[in-house]
Amino acid sequence: MGTHLHITAWVLGIILFFVAFALAGKNDKGAKIVHMIVRLLYLIIIATGVELYVRTGMKIPGFGGEYIGKMILGILVIGFMEMTLVRKKKGKSVTGVLIGFIIFAIVTILLGLRLPIGFHIF
């Protein structure tokens, strides 16, 4: 596993999240299947993130706290994604959790781009 698998899982997860968001609230089989696939991607994202941290993040001095912070932010992003889908499915307001998802996703991505592992844009 590696950085590319982690990023690919995130990209697929976010794309399928928006597909599931568009389908949520409709009581059809397709919406449930997409939501389950997104949940599977959550597990893959968490597993690859932990693997990246254990394999390389722990060995880079001076960045331990930032990697742990990024893991916490990543889990919060996944939590907001799931809360958004469940609230939409139940017909409740999703504005707050959707804004939370967007804010935490942006912060997590920016922190990830700042850290030594992965792509170096900054």
Swiss-Prot record:
Its main location: membrane. InterPro entries: UPF0344. Pfam families: DUF1516. Belongs to the UPF0344 family. It comes from the Bacteria. The lineage of its organism: Bacteria, Bacillati, Bacillota, Bacilli, Bacillales. Keywords: Cell membrane, Membrane, Transmembrane, Transmembrane helix. GO terms for cellular component: plasma membrane. It is a multi-pass membrane protein. NCBIfam families: PRK13673.1-5 (NF010198). The keyword Transport does not apply. The chain crosses the membrane at residues 5-25, 33-53, 60-80, 93-113. The keyword Cytoplasm does not apply. This is UPF0344 protein BPUM_1008. It is found in: Cell membrane.
